[in-house]
Swiss-Prot record:
Primary location recorded for the protein, binned into one broad class: Golgi
A cellular-component GO term for this protein: Golgi apparatus
Membrane topology recorded in Swiss-Prot or TrEMBL: Single-pass membrane protein
Species assigned in the record: Schizosaccharomyces pombe (strain 972 / ATCC 24843)
UniProtKB keywords: Golgi apparatus, Membrane, Transmembrane, Transmembrane helix
Compartment(s): Golgi apparatus membrane
Biased composition (Basic residues): 334-343
Region (Disordered): 66-89, 161-191, 252-343
Protein name listed in UniProt: Uncharacterized protein C36.11
Transmembrane segments: 96-116
Biased composition (Basic and acidic residues): 280-289, 301-311, 322-333
Position of the signal peptide: none
Compositionally biased residues, Low complexity: 71-84, 290-299
Positions with biased composition (Polar residues): 165-188
Upper taxonomic lineage: Eukaryota, Fungi, Dikarya, Ascomycota, Taphrinomycotina
Length: 343
């Protein structure tokens, strides 16, 4: 049985089919009306126990109808009317629509990275060129100063540098003696006490295996008696001195005379102090003259030579009794006579 146009037109909402009219049949054919746009799908499925009995032919049925308010011709393909744009261009779902901005952003970032890399490269190249130029000028200045120093350097009698710390490296002290212990005072280390260099030599010998009594002290210092808190200070750790401008011995005496300075001895200072203390304030000028004459000579004279200084004929030890000193001594005698007469 076929479905006519008039009978299918009654399926518009609001109208009902007659209950006795068979909508579905096995020989399915219909004429599509003009007011139906897209789809009229009629699905006829057999039941789970399909037989040739026509009573089982309409087990499942679905009708989907879409209506168009403006009916068009049925010969128009639905895809052409749905995808046509007003300007006539076709809308394509290309991947370039999404990948285009991504590629553009990535390209811009890569260009920025390349620009910054070039800037860094040129700046580093310029810095390296300046560094090489500075090193070349520095080497030239060093060589020039070395040449000037070599030309102007004179032979000096002693070391006349700056602050210098002498420490003896040759009897390697054990580690337990270099770490101070808490039984000692924090501010007064007993290893740096007042008998600095009591057993040390006057002249510091060069480092090496020197066979002196200081090396034998290692046996005593590493023994079990020195592990406790009461150990005797060793001479090796104290053998150090500080020199300001001249090489010094351990006790602090200079090893070489400094040119341009006159060495003064303790004996001459004591001699001058005793002379100046025995006179009154009126004799200060004469005392100064006596001090200037005895300072340089008392270091070089023996005790027996101090009584006959005028009899010396050594040209290197010249003690002049000048006529000026004779005149001053005569004036002093006259002045003392006048004072005695006055009193």
């Amino acid at each position: 049985m076929s479905i006519s146009n008039d009978s299918l037109a009654s399926t518009v909402p609001g109208d009902e089919l007659p209950s006795s009219y068979p909508v579905f049949s096995s020989d399915f054919s219909y004429i599509k009306p003009s007011h139906v746009l897209d789809v009229v799908t009629v699905t006829s499925t057999a039941g789970p126990e399909a037989t040739d009995d026509p009573s089982y032919s309409g087990f499942y049925s679905t009708v989907i109808s879409t209506q168009n308010p403006e009916p068009t011709s049925a010969s128009t393909p639905p895809s052409a009317s749905a995808s046509s744009l007003p300007n006539g261009a076709q809308k394509h779902n290309h991947t370039g629509v999404i990948a285009g901005p991504i590629v553009g952003v990535l390209g811009g970032l890569i260009v920025l990275v390349i620009i910054f890399y070039c800037l860094r490269h040129f700046k580093r190249k310029k810095f390296l060129a300046e560094q090489q130029e500075f090193e070349r000028q520095f080497e030239e200045e060093k060589s020039r100063l070395a040449a000037v120093r070599k030309n102007t350097e004179q032979e000096k009698m002693g070391y006349r540098g700056g602050y210098q710390m002498h420490s003896t490296p040759w009897a390697s002290s054990p580690r337990n003696s270099t770490i101070p212990q808490r039984s000692q005072s924090f501010y007064n280390d007993t290893r740096r006490s007042s008998d600095l260099g009591a057993n040390a030599a006057d002249f510091v010998t060069p480092p090496g295996n020197v066979a002196n009594s200081d090396n034998i002290r290692i046996l005593k210092r590493n023994s079990i008696a020195t592990i406790g808190n009461y150990r005797s200070p060793s001479a090796l750790e104290k053998r150090r001195s500080i020199s300001y401008g001249a090489v010094q011995s351990v006790q602090g005496r200079p090893l070489a005379p400094i040119p341009g300075r006159r060495p003064l001895s303790i004996s001459s200072d004591l001699y001058n102090d005793s002379n100046s203390g025995s006179h009154s304030n009126d004799d200060s000028d004469e005392t100064k003259l006596k001090q200037s004459s005895t300072e340089s000579s008392s270091e070089l004279l023996d005790e027996k030579d101090k009584f006959d200084k005028n009899s010396l004929n050594d040209p290197f030890v010249t003690i002049r009794k000048s006529s000026y000193e004779h005149e001053i001594s005569e004036e002093h005698k006259k002045h003392s006579k006048k004072r005695s007469e006055h009193f």
